[in-house]
Amino acid sequence: MGKNQRRDKIARLISWGHWFTFANIILCLLIGIIYIDSTPSPTTFISTVYLIVNWIGHFAFLPFVFFIILIFPFCLLIPYSKVLRSIAALISSLGIVALIFDALFFRHYGYHLNAYSLAQMAKDAEAAFTGASFVIILMIMLGFLILLGFELLLANYTWKHLSELQHRRLGAPATTVFVLCFFASHSIHVWADAELYDP
């Protein structure tokens, strides 16, 4: 394979990675609704705007980080679309499963997963489903396989329709919104800590 062919192939894979990540951002935004539903509703217009900006900024950032840290290097190291799509689908499935577990845990307990909370979750699950550990594990594995199948479909769809997706000109405006929301939510949080926090 010539140098230009390899460069074009890698550019196409990276472009595919952007669209695959965008689709996962939408999925993460939907999962993020569980967090919003688990907390008290905002009482003012400004707090509602902050909630929306924070929701978009944070849940768009999660898949983006997975892309930059895990998928992007594979685009350079393994420039084979079938292998890359499989790896990306597996990585995305694992990340989304972790997000779903955290969202459901947050909904039930009011705090995020950590070393203590995993032990608490296992203890509560064992108490709730006494003697049914096998069923729980089987359900989790089945759920993961369904999600992995969905991610593989998503990876293949975005690959096969890449040229159509690129012509939609949705990427730049969506990226602008995600980046602005991310920086706005963090800036507001820093400002609030500096101005309103009273130890």
Regions found by a protein language model. Give the residues of each.
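Transmembrane and membrane-interface helices of multi-pass
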Residues: G2-P199
